[in-house]
Regions:
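Helical segment within the ABC ATPase nucleotide-binding domain
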Residues: 189-201
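H-loop/switch region of ABC-family ATPase nucleotide-binding domains
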Residues: 210-211
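ABC ATPase "signature
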Residues: 234-235
């Protein structure tokens, strides 16, 4: 059984040599949604999350909502094991793949074929697994002979196709996503959406951050509402979305 458990988790980002930066700190506070606390004359701390607790189990399809800077990305990175809490504890049991940045690990100067291996290794695949999936990834990308060219020579659309084909080739127990992934021309978008539904359907725990009410209604059975680093509401999808979007219209 897969399990994620957060117990009173807080995440702080220290900023040193911050004296005489009151305007910058204020702008940063607005941009991140976090709280700024001055520890000393030369140390300011931005609190991205504060006292967040939750338990996610098999079958949970979690939607994550909140304004820009509410702490969604910070929470996604904690759930992915990228950030370690500065206070509290995070327990993650199950193979986890994060699709927050699907181009993480890609080398612009390496060929498409080389980058399939680099990105796959970054996601935790073993060499044997990469070998087994390589041809299917290459075929799904639709890049053909361009796979022998450096990644930097690709158009932005081609780069995203390669990154998408590689990143979605896994079948994790826990899937963390920042928005729904879809890219390319109409033919590729159709194939990409089909693959995304297959990926979401096969995972045991899904966490999807999105601003789309329709997307969250379609894919999630529970929604978490973050505000200024705090968990404001946690409940059934319809109930939380009605409260959130109703509040946004006021």
């Amino acid at each position: 059984m897969s399990l994620i458990k957060l117990d009173n988790v807080s995440v702080e980002f220290p900023i040193y040599n911050s004296s005489s930066r009151s305007l910058k700190n204020r702008v940063l506070s607005i941009a991140t949604g976090g709280k700024i606390e001055r520890k000393t004359d030369r140390l300011v701390v931005i609190r991205g999350l504060e006292g967040v607790s939750m338990t996610l189990k098999d079958g949970d399809r979690i939607g994550l909502i909140g304004h820009n800077g509410s702490g969604k990305t910070t929470l996604l990175r904690v759930l992915s094991g990228i950030y370690t809490p500065t206070q509290g504890a995070a327990f993650i049991d199950g193979t986890c793949v994060s699709l927050i940045n699907i181009q993480l690990g890609i080398d612009p100067d390496a060929t498409g074929r080389e980058n399939i291996r680099l990105r796959s290794a970054m996601m935790g695949m073993l060499p044997k697994e990469i070998d087994e999936k390589f041809d299917a990834i290459a075929e799904f990308s639709g890049l053909g002979d361009f796979l022998d060219m450096p990644f930097r020579t690709y158009s932005s659309g081609m780069q995203l196709r390669l990154a998408f084909a590689t990143s979605t080739s896994v079948r994790p127990e826990i899937l963390i996503m920042d928005e729904w992934l879809s890219t390319g021309d109409e033919d590729f978008k159709e194939r990409a959406n089909k693959r995304m539904h297959e990926l979401v359907g096969s995972t045991k725990i899904l966490v999807l951050a999105s601003h789309s009410r329709e997307l969250l209604m379609k894919n999630c059975n529970r929604v978490l509402w973050l505000e200024h680093g705090h968990l404001k509401m946690d409940g059934p999808t319809q109930e939380v979305l009605s409260a959130y979007f109703g509040n946004a219209q006021k």
